[in-house]
Amino acid sequence: MQSRKDWILAGQDMLRKEGIAGLKLSALTATLGVSTGSFYHHFADFEQYLGAVAEFFSADRVQGVIDQTMIDNPDPVTRIRRLAKLSLEDHTFELDAAMRIWATMDERAAVTVERSERLVLGFLAQAFEDLGFAPAEAALRARILLSVNIASLRTSNEKGRRNYFRQALEVLVAPVGKV
């Protein structure tokens, strides 16, 4: 029998690949190789399941990636780079794109996207403050860098996304007047 978390992770993977329209119970049971009985052991209905998939995105996935960046307490730029690297490796950027589309149709997804943005913006703003930027400027730089990531999701080429992010980060971490 699959665990509740197995179902949620499978749903997030399907959401990332197929979008919200492709997230169906029949496809999930086929992917996991189980019957619907396993599903109903963990969730009362599909609506409850969708709420759990949405909640897990910010509560576990995004926070987990942020927590991993702090291992060994690296310098601020390394923390930001780790966040980008880990987000690429575990497909968080792609899932974020799917979550943003879903958020236009479902309040649960909208709430979790907003929560994940707050987590990421707080993380980035702290990194910029640690680089010596005043809080207001650090918050602005954090928002710009997050916007760069959201915009780069439309770039289908992973190398292009990485270059775009690297160039933006170089500009944003440079002291004022040094770009």
Each PLM stretch: what is its role?
Residues 1-2, 179:
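N-terminal intrinsically disordered/low-complexity leader segments
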